[in-house]
Amino acid sequence: MPNAGDGPTSSERRAILKIAGLAALGFNRPALAQGLCRDGYEQGRCPLSREIATRAIRPVFAPTGWKTTALESITFELENYRKEAAFYVALLGWKLRSDDGKQAVLDIGDWGSVVFRQVSRDNYAVPPPEGRKIVVSGFAFVIEPWNTSQVAAELEKRGLKPLADNRGKLESFHVKDPDGWDVQICNGFGFAGSRGTANGVSLAEPLPFAPTGWHTVWLDHVSFRVNNYKNSASFYSNLLGWTPSYDEGSQNELLIGEVGDILVRGGNPFLSSVSTQRGAYLDHISFGIAPWDVDAVKAALLTRGLPVAADTSSAHPGPDGKYVKDDIHQAAFQSYHTVTPNGFDLQISWMTKDKRLALATAVKPKALLEP
């Protein structure tokens, strides 16, 4: 075992070098979960007053009354899908369901699925950030109640243009959100209705390292960047029944039924200088894993040559009055960021369904805690 005064081990040196290389691709600062107003209102990153920043908008349309009951899939487009699939199998214990030479489908335990779809640099559906070779192009959720004609009618009534996508017993519609993001709404007879069928399917790519033995137990949060977070939060709340936690002034964490959470973050419509980005994009995903031990998880990442960046998202005032990041061992939210083979910002945390609001509580501005 190295002494405290020893230099980094060979695995730590590899991780450090990898971080240095990834910094050139924009991974020098993880996409953290706190909003711009965590440290207060009417200040540099959050110039509006609390009253204006958190002011409600008129709902984008009337609620459908639907409830989201399952995650059907999250679709990634990337330039080496088999390396990515093998990485998640080894790191997070996902199971390969299928691989047809063009894409791989993996199950996340018994509660979710991902699609890794092979593309070339010139045919991404959603352009990836500069230097990256991977992007999330859409997500799909199961809703109830389901009646095909009624679902289509309700979508059309709200000005959406549903595009049917049916395969076997799966019935679904694709619609576009306010930023043009692809949302698939399903009946539950697709991936969600047939999980556990991955037995006997072998990876075409060798595992990049020894399996960690971890299990992915929870969709901690999806970090979803949009042009107008209030508008998007209203869209998903009223369309799919997602429950808002609180409006922070730059983001709103929504509870996706019993599935997990999503951080809808972006421009505030009451800020005159708000800039319009290219459209919605998903900058990182955080998965809750088990078992969790702060030091053991970090060591497991480092020994596999992976970059590691701690993220508590919470902070406290230091002696000089400036905010200091909370120590991960005592923080209410414990997590690490790392990077996948194709350059995606992957976050793993200790979050479970039972403590799903720990992050939202930890980063809630003090002004919102006041009566």
Segments (PLM) and residue ranges:
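N-terminal secretory signal peptides
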Residues: 1-11, 24
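Structured segments of extracytoplasmic/periplasmic soluble domains
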Residues: 84, 90-95, 142, 154, ...
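A short local loop/turn or secondary-structure capping micro-motif enriched for an aromatic residue
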Residues: 114-116, 122-126, 191-194, 263, ...
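Short beta-strand/turn micro-motifs at beta-sheet edges
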Residues: 60-64, 124-129, 208-211, 270-275
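Non-catalytic surface loops within mature trypsin-like serine protease
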Residues: 78-80, 110, 120, 143-145, ...
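Core segments of cupin and vicinal oxygen chelate
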Residues: 75-120, 165, 171-174, 223-270, ...
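Vicinal oxygen chelate
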Residues: 15-64, 69-80, 104-107, 126-217, 224, 298-371, ...
